[in-house]
Each structure stands twice: as structure tokens, then as C-alpha cells.
Amino acid sequence: MDNLVSSKRPDISFPVGYHDLHPNVSINFQLNRFYGWVGDDSMLTEMRQAVAGVNDYPMFTKIILELGEKALTRLEVLKGAYYLRLAEFFLPSGDPRKLPTRQRFVDLLLDHLQVAPSVYSRIPFGTGWLPAYRLTPMKPRGTLVVFGGFDSYIEEWLPAALFFRDAGYDTILFEGPGQGAALELAHLTMSPDWEKPVKAVLDFFRLDAVTLMGFSLGGGLVIRAAAFEPRVRRVIAYDVCPNMLEGMLRSVPPPGREKLHECFGSGNEDAVNSFVAGAIAKSLLLEWAIQQGLHNTGLKTPFEMLKHYQKYETASISSRLTQDVLLMAGAEDHYIPVHQLPDQITTLTHVRSLTARLFTRAEQAQNHCQVGNMGLAFRLMNDWMTGLGPIERLPAML
């Protein structure tokens, strides 16, 4: 029996269009990102008017929290929930509003989408646990395991999980170390050894042949996991992320970027920390990236955090992959430079098959994780999995 009720669940749709809502590229992206899960055009007018002229995170979060409360008062639950998530996204880790706002978002979304408590599990891992949701159709045609990246709460992705569940896939969402509840509640910090949480999830659910998808930073982590976990038979990098450090340093405006590269490359810790302290005052994107990176790694300084993220690369292990692989990228991704798509392609020298897809402005899918036309991305993944047919089981071990 389908383990995600009910017949009263709201219809899920994904709007098409990337909108100019704020002149700051980072804020504008996040406004579009969370609108993309709701699709209520009234959000566009509300957000554009409310954040006009706002150029600091404290005021931005105050305004978005107010929009969320107003939406909930009007019983616009999905809109209100994602407004809360949008505001929480920019709240620093020490803010007392952060965890309560996160929990309200989760509770509201689960209730609105009619997600039954029985689909939720806590998977033992290290000194803590990993949260997971399993959404199973009546007659599954395969298993899809999904995780996020640098800043994700997996609940945000539930509308997409419903899409794949309704397409016939036994769909499992989980958070690994440094993500969502695994970080905030179980206190597990980010680790590049992603085959370990994937192994824990596959063991817990007794799975032997899956498609594994990672989104955002997860597009690099999924390559790492697939290199060492043979039960991963198909791989989706949504989007590619073969070099996380390059993406992080890209958030530094030029020409300071070159100076930071030089200081970091020479191992000058004091110079890196001093430079970052000054640079974040000039870049909202960098301010957020450093704040989030320190939070999800549990490290104390920008230098330590950048050294940690230097380990998040795929060039050294990509040749180990022998699976079917789908790589995706946005032509105008402001986090991940587009050259990382061919970079990743050239290192996958032993895969069974390789499909790469670059999304463009003409499709309104040119941005990170195809924000602006996420439905197109989800349909592509579904078509790719369908086209490959059923996964062949591995021979039984003697």
C-alpha cells in the first residue's frame, strides 16, 4: 500500500520562469528558489515589493518572516511555510529564532503535504543519527535515494519526492552529516566521505540496487559515494560539483579573488582570515557562504573551513565509477562555474554510460539546480531512468 497518504494531498506543480526580484544575485536566487516550490504568482509581487531597497540580511529576514506570518494568517500554508524557510536560510547559526523557525517550516510542510509520520526514520550513524523519509508507491519500478548539499533541509525537496513517488519510484530522502536535522539536532558535521552515510542508509533499508541522486554540493558527493559503494547502480549529479573549493572562492568578488587564492595557496592562515573578514562586508554572497560553511563544518576560522572544503573534489576518484551516470549543469550557475561540467565528464573514464545536460536561459533553467524550471530537470531525470530500464541486480555473494 502507498505509504504516503492521502487522496486529499494538494496537487504538485513547478512553475516556469526566473524572475528579477532583487538586484543582489544571491538574494534574487533564493527568492526564486523558494517561489519555485510554491508556484503562487502572488509571491512574486509580495517579495519584489517587500525587499525593494533591502541590502542586509537582518532586515531581509525580518521582512520575510512577516510575510510568512501574514500568509499563515490567510491560511496560505504552503506559501507561509516556504517564507519561513527562506527567512531561516539567512538566519545565522546562533540566532535563537533559527531552530524554532526551521521546525515550524518542517511541521507545516509535512502537514500540508499529508506526509504520514510512518514514512520517517532516524538511521543510527556515528555518534548521532540521519533523518530519512521513504515514500513508496504501490508497485515500485526502482529505488531512488536522494540527498542535498551545502545548505539543504531535505523536507524542502518533498514536493519533488512526491513527483518521483508518483512516477513509480520508491523514493528515499535523507540528510547526511552537516545537513538539516543531522547537523542541527544530531550534531553531525560535514564530511567528504559520503560513501559512509550512503552505506548506512542502504543497510538500514536493506537495499541492493539503487539510483543515487545528490543535488547542489551533493552533485559532487554523489560521485564520491558511487566510487566506493557498489549497490549504487545509477548516479545523478544535480548539478555537477567536482570542485567545491573553486565554487566557494568564486563567491569572492574580483580582483580580491586572486589575492585570496594567493594567500590560501601559500598557507597564510592569518592573511586569509583577515582578508575574509574585510571582504564579507562587501559581498552578501560571501558573507552567507562563510557563515554557512563554518556552521556545517563546526570549524572556527575561514582558513580552516576552506582547507576542509579542499577535500571535496572528484578528480581523484571519478575513474572508479562504472555506473550509468547523468550529469546536469546550469549555463549561468552563479555558484558552480560551467566549465566544471566538462571537467567532470573527462574524468569519468570507466562509466557504463554517460549523459550530460546543460540547461539554458531559453529554457529558464540556466541557474543552479535549474531554479526557474525545476520541473524540466525532474522530467529529464525521470526520462533518463525510464530509458535505461530496470536495474540489473548484482550477483549474489557466496
What does each model-identified segment do?
Residues 91, 360-376:
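Catalytic histidine-centered segment of alpha/beta-hydrolase-like enzymes
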Residues 227-306, 329:
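Hydrolase active-site cap/lid region
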Residues 160, 323, 337-347:
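Short alpha-helix in the alpha/beta-hydrolase fold that links the catalytic acid
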Residues 64, 94-139:
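N-terminal cap/lid segment of alpha/beta-hydrolase-fold proteins
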Residues 346-366:
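Catalytic histidine neighborhood in serine/cysteine hydrolases
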Residues 156, 187-208:
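Alpha/beta-hydrolase active-site loop
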Residues 164-181:
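Conserved alpha/beta-hydrolase
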Residues 321-322, 327-329, 333:
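Short beta-strand/loop motif that positions the catalytic acidic residue
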